[in-house]
Amino acid sequence: MIRRVTSPALFPPPTYSHASVVEAGTRIAFLAGSVPLDAEGKLVGEGDPVRQAEQVVADLEEQLRAVASDLAHVLSTEVYVVSGDTAVLSAVWEVVEASGLSTGPHSSTLLGVACLGYSGQLVEITATAAVPDAGPEVRS
């Protein structure tokens, strides 16, 4: 269902692929940005990008569960971090690597940005995932 591609002509990515290919007819879920808020809408990990990344990945897992998918079926992500410091970006990426997102490995882009949508928010991940055929119907 998912074919992960790494081009031998390019620098080998450490924990992601250059592209993900899915066959026509596969159900695809386009997920809204996962943010570091708890179920009551309160910010988790204020001032701590690593803690926020952990919450974002946990919330992403819930989003995927709601569409009958999981981290292993993620095709592509964009990881946004409010920082221009590569050490901070690397620390957030380590959380991504430690999660099931690195199982694929999926294609990904890591970006340092000026700000995100919620006050105090430092991390956000958007994702596209395949939805396995054998999964239950998607909840609405």
Segments (PLM) and residue ranges:
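Short, polar/acidic, helix-capping and beta-turn segments at strand->helix junctions
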Residues: 1-140
